[in-house]
Swiss-Prot record:
GO terms for molecular function: nucleic acid binding; zinc ion binding. GO terms for cellular component: chromosome; nuclear speck; nucleus; spliceosomal complex. It is found in: Nucleus; Chromosome; Nucleus speckle. Residues 71-195 are annotated as: Disordered. InterPro entries: ZNF830-like, Znf_C2H2_sf. The keyword Cell cycle applies. It comes from the Eukaryota. This is Zinc finger protein 830.
Length: 356
């Protein structure tokens, strides 16, 4: 009897293991493949931008479309644009070719500067997050190529200008923020650059010219709108043109709208007054009906009172008649007896019964 119990326990454990394996497979299939998604050691899903845990993979699209996530993305993009714009506004002196020893010094100083200032990649964001910044920073390639261009026909006297460039760059690096990325120094020739120098995944500094152009366009549009709104009424002789420029309704349309609104208000007032009159009529009708009912009740009461009085009078009359009839009957009986007495007395007693 003990052997079947063990078999059942073993079967239950195997079933549990199979169920857990299936759950793991289903959970692995449902994993979110997104640069913004992150799984911890326990397999819990979290958002890299918001630093918030997400209960289920089904809630990931709703979180991406949420207001908080969009605000965080906009803030990060805004800080990226603000930190990258000052680095491009620094003006460097004219760049010339230096001797072979100068590039080595430049490289050593660049490594020191990179160690002193942390790069923008410490934000722990995915590489494909700022794709727009990468496309906008593509305009820096010509300037970088100019910085890294060939300058073979320069004399050795240009070394002094190279030293001035180094001093200017050191002064500018002290002004850069920790999130900014310094520009690469020029080398002796373009062949020393790696093959994928302009195709790396590191977020490049966006050019401030595009931002300035967008700001200028927005200002122009705002000025145009402000000028159209600032025009006084009647600036143009034609009222229709004046209304069109000031982006308002034409006088005729305005009059029509006002007339329609007036008619609408009149209809509303009429409906309200009709409702009030109907309510008052209904109340008056009910009051009249109540008064009529009260009058009918009073009339019925009077009729009942008259009927009762009639009955009492009839009863009294009947009693009087009965008493009179009794008295008359008694009077008649008494008169008959008195009339018979003398006739009996005057008769002869001898003749009594003679004819019988």
């Amino acid at each position: 009897m003990a052997v079947p119990g063990k078999k059942k326990l073993v079967a239950q454990e195997e079933l549990r293991k199979l169920m857990k394996a299936k759950q793991r497979e289903s959970s692995s299939k449902k994993r979110i493949e997104s640069p913004l998604a992150k799984y911890n050691s326990l397999g819990h899903l979290s958002c890299v931008v918001c630093n918030s845990l997400i209960k289920s993979e089904l809630l990931w699209p709703a979180h991406i479309l949420g207001k908080q996530h969009k605000e965080k993305v906009a803030e990060l993009k805004g800080t990226k644009a603000t930190t990258s714009s000052p680095s491009n506004t620094i003006e460097y002196p004219r760049i010339t070719k230096r001797k072979g020893s100068e590039p080595e010094k430049q490289e050593s100083k660049r490594t020191k500067g990179s160690e002193d200032h942390p790069s923008a990649s410490t934000t722990k964001l995915p590489e494909e997050f700022f794709e727009k910044e990468k496309t906008s920073s593509a305009g820096n390639a010509p300037s970088l190529k100019l910085l890294a261009g060939d300058y073979e026909d320069v004399d050795d006297d240009d070394a002094e200008e190279g030293e001035e460039y180094e001093n200017a760059k050191e002064a500018s690096s002290s002004l850069l923020k920790p999130a900014e990325i310094p520009l690469p120094p020029p080398t002796s020739s373009a062949d020393n650059l790696p093959a994928d120098f302009f195709e790396n995944k590191m977020p490049l500094v966006s050019h401030s010219g595009s931002v300035l152009k967008a700001d200028i366009q927005e200002k122009i549009v705002e000025r145009k709108e402000n000028t159209a709104e600032a025009l006084p009424e009647g600036f143009f002789d034609d009222p229709e043109v004046d209304a069109k420029v000031r982006k308002v309704d034409a006088p005729k349309d305005q009059m029509d709208k006002e007339w329609e609104e007036f008619q609408k208000e009149i209809r509303q007032v009429n409906t309200v007054s009709e409702a009030i009159v109907a309510e008052e009529d209904e109340e008056g009708r009910l009051d009249r009906q109540i008064d009529e009912i009260d009058e009918q009740i009073q009339c019925y009461r009077r009729v009942e009172h008259l009927r009762d009085r009639k009955d009492t009078l009839q009863d009294a009359k009947m009693e009087v008649l009965k008493s009179k009839s009794n008295e008359k009957w008694q009077d008649e009986i008494g008169s008959d007896d008195e009339e018979k007495l003398p006739s009996l007395l005057y008769q002869n007693w001898r003749e009594k019964g003679a004819f019988h």
